[in-house]
Swiss-Prot record:
CDD domains: RING-HC_RNF141. It is found in: Membrane. A zinc finger (RING-type) spans 155-192. GO terms for molecular function: ubiquitin-protein transferase activity; zinc ion binding. It is a lipid-anchor. Keywords: Lipoprotein, Membrane, Metal-binding, Myristate, Zinc, Zinc-finger. This is RING finger protein 141. The gene is Rnf141. It comes from the Eukaryota. Pfam families: zf-RING_2. One of its GO terms (biological process) is protein autoubiquitination. It comes from Rattus norvegicus. A lipid is attached at G2 (N-myristoyl glycine).
Length: 230
């Protein structure tokens, strides 16, 4: 019976527009992800990116932000910090912070790309078989993808409008969608986190400065995807 429901769900997803189907798949995957699997994926990204960028000047480091995974609702508040480091100098050149949804998107992008790169390098005639020769600065390209994911925040409901409202759980919505939802509900449409008062229910993102954003992130009330300052 369970398998039948799962098959029917997948059939419905397959009929959705590609962008919406991708969003639904990512939400389902994040919902079933265990904490151990999550940590495994963080470690896997570190291994994969290190292998692909071997011999290059820069590399990426993925870390769970300390304290962000200690809650029973870790999927809502956990943050993954992605840092680009110059190997020779040890200088941190860029750092971004992602929520779980953004991290899963990046994980899929990088592992999919890495599989192709490693397959290509295995058939290469180069004697060292160094996959880093495929792309001269892979870390910078990946960091660009992280920036894209964290800058282009969309409404979690319609996946079309620009998110201009953020809840304390860090899920973002456009004004039109959240107005319809909040008429009858006092919780987040995505994670169902209850809002205890009107003053915390719907927080308007009002083009804050970088300093405002940094402080907002540290207070765990900001949306993911803003520049992270270690």
């Amino acid at each position: 019976m369970g398998q039948q429901i799962s098959d029917q769900t997948q059939l419905v997803i397959n009929k959705l527009p590609e962008k919406v189907a991708k969003h639904v798949t990512l939400v389902r995957e994040s919902g079933s992800l265990t904490y151990e699997e999550f940590l495994g994926r963080v470690a896997e990204l570190n291994d994969v990116t290190a292998k692909i960028a071997a011999g290059q000047e820069k590399h990426l480091l993925f870390e769970v932000q300390p304290g962000s995974d200690s809650s029973a609702f870790w999927k809502v508040v956990v943050r993954v910090v992605c840092t680009k480091i110059n190997k020779s100098s040890g200088i941190v050149e860029a750092s971004r912070i992602m929520n779980l949804y953004q991290f899963i998107q990046l994980y899929k992008d990088i592992t999919s790309q890495a599989a192709g790169v490693l397959a290509q390098s295995s058939t290469s005639e180069e004697p060292d078989g160094n996959p880093s020769s495929v792309t001269s600065c892979q870390a910078s390209l990946w960091m660009g993808r992280v920036k894209q994911l964290t800058d282009e925040e969309e409404c979690c409901i319609c996946m079309d409008g620009r998110a201009d409202l953020i809840l304390p759980c860090a899920h973002s919505f456009c004004q039109k969608c959240i107005d319809k939802w909040s008429d009858r509900h006092r919780n987040c449409p995505i994670c169902r986190l209850q809002m205890t008062g009107a003053n915390e229910s719907w927080v308007v993102s009002d083009a804050p400065t970088e300093d405002d954003m940094a402080n907002y992130i540290l207070n765990m009330a900001d949306e993911a995807g803003q520049p992270h300052r270690p």
